[in-house]
Structure formats: structure tokens, C-alpha cells
Curated annotation (Swiss-Prot):
Localization of this protein: Mitochondrion
Protein's organism: Dictyostelium discoideum
Keyword annotations of the record: Mitochondrion, Ribonucleoprotein, Ribosomal protein
Matching SUPFAM superfamilies: Ribosomal L27 protein-like
Residue stretches of biased makeup (Polar residues): 30-43
A Gene Ontology biological process term: translation
Highest taxon in the source lineage: Eukaryota
Family, similarity comment: Belongs to the bacterial ribosomal protein bL27 family.
Gene Ontology, cellular component aspect: mitochondrial large ribosomal subunit
One matching Pfam family: Ribosomal_L27
Region feature Disordered, mapped onto this chain: 27-48
Entry GO MF terms: structural constituent of ribosome
Name of protein: Large ribosomal subunit protein bL27m
């Protein structure tokens, strides 16, 4: 038993028991960081004007991602696919086939203008008042 002599002593046994009694461990695990604690800014997508509603030039009709709605007459499309009015008028929605004979349809947004700029007024110029005026009927485009 000389091999085990000195390995066990009363002092070493006493210290080990005291260490095991006095050691403390965390009773609650510390919280880790999360990657989900933020939100993105709202994009405010969707319809801004409905059917038969009055719009003015430059007013946004719909904000969208991709071409869910396609631009029709008197309507423009921005680089982010926002559809806006080009004239004063009423908004209208329609469905048309993608190509003739197709079952798939596309939705279009158009604006029916209230005013047209192509008004022809025919006037007869009286040449008896001034001698320098030619004897012609003139069409004036306003």
C-alpha cells in the first residue's frame, strides 16, 4: 500500500468537500441576443384611387410590386411599377385576354378624360374689313 500512501489525507478530503459545498452555479441561463428585434418601413402599396373616381395629372392610382395591373390609356407607369394618371378624368378598370384566344387575362387601369384638347372651331373671316386678309376659311385648333 505504499503506492497509495500520501494520496489521501484528511486535509485533502476536507478541502474537496468544502469546495463542493461552496461552489455556486448560475441558476438561470443568461439571455442571448436575437436577430428579430427590428421591423422594416411600411411600403404603402395598394390602390389609392378606385373605379369612377376623379384623378388629376400625376396622381397615383396604384402602387404595386411588379405588374399586377397594366397601364391603359392616359395612364403612365413609373420605374417601381406605380401607375399614375396623365390627364384629368375618371379611373376605370378592365380585363383583357393576354393575346387573342387566350384564357389568361390581364388587368388594365385606364383614365377616361373629362376634357379633350382637340377642339376644332371653324370661323369665317370677313375679308371686307381689311384688304390685306386673304379670302380663306381657316381652321383654328385650340
Amino acid at each position: 500500500m505504499s503506492f497509495f500512501r500520501g494520496t489521501f489525507s484528511t486535509s485533502s478530503l476536507f478541502i474537496n468537500t468544502v469546495d463542493s459545498v461552496t461552489k455556486r452555479f448560475a441558476t438561470k441561463k443568461s439571455a442571448g441576443s436575437t436577430k428579430n428585434g427590428r421591423t422594416s418601413q411600411p411600403k404603402n402599396l395598394g390602390l389609392k384611387k378606385s373605379g369612377n373616381q376623379l384623378v388629376y395629372p400625376g396622381e397615383i392610382i396604384i402602387r404595386q410590386r411588379g405588374t399586377e395591373f397594366h397601364p391603359g390609356t392616359f395612364v403612365g407607369m413609373g420605374k417601381d411599377h406605380t401607375i399614375f394618371s396623365k390627364t384629368i378624368g375618371l379611373v376605370s378598370f378592365s380585363k383583357e385576354p393576354k393575346f387573342p384566344g387566350s384564357k389568361k387575362t390581364r388587368r388594365f387601369i385606364s383614365v377616361a378624360p373629362l376634357y379633350t384638347n382637340n377642339i376644332n372651331i371653324n370661323t369665317n373671316i370677313d375679308t371686307s374689313i381689311d384688304t390685306n386678309v386673304n379670302n380663306n376659311n381657316s381652321n383654328i385648333n385650340i
